[in-house]
Amino acid sequence: PLYEYLWAYNGDQMASELNMESKHSIEKQTAHHVDCFTTVSDITARECKELLDKPVDMVLPNGFENDFVPKDGTFTKKRKAARRHLLDVANALTGDDIQEDALIVSTSGRYEFRNKGIDVFIEAMNRLRFDESLQKQVVAFIEVPGWTAGPRQELAERLDSGRQFDTPLDMPVLTHWLHNMDDDNVLNRLRTLGMNNAKDDRVKLVFVPCYLTGDDGILNMSYYDLVLGNDLCVYPSYYE
């Protein structure tokens, strides 16, 4: 509905109604005074024209450099290591026997619950949980930085042991404790849907609420190394 009637919205008025005047003002003034104003998609170019009153000078390609993906044997080695670690984390959290051929799915980005489609991702995994035609296990990861209080010590100890586990931890959906456990959008949605990684759930969901810089205390791999372990990455952002 927003984009169908985008032409009818006034950016200044909407910012006032949504109590976002400061943020909107900085963005608008920047757009009007920079030497070159760009964006990375036609739809965000429309937003700029209608909401910031400033057409972009150029729409740039949105992608990665060619060397983003490791080549040949390096790719295979890194992918295998990432998959093994992701499956180990899932087992250590849930106590379930995660098969080697499990489908690993993830979404990531800024913690904008609706704007980045995190709500859609969770709902999709929940529907898949009840799909009787599902032939293999699915392990889904939400990798968005939240208000992290620190890595879960009991999870780190399980991972350090190198063992496989058949009993779950408390809160078997979360890798790092949060300061706002009762107010976190992802955790609240999982509670509402009853997604708690039960033993008989064919779809397991793991929330990783930290920056993946290689030293988070649980995954300890950079995002660009870890993402190689996925079979599918999903980015259902509202604005795209």
Where are these regions (language model features)?
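Catalytic cores of nucleotide-sugar-dependent glycosyltransferases that transfer UDP/GDP/TDP-activated
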Residues: 1-240
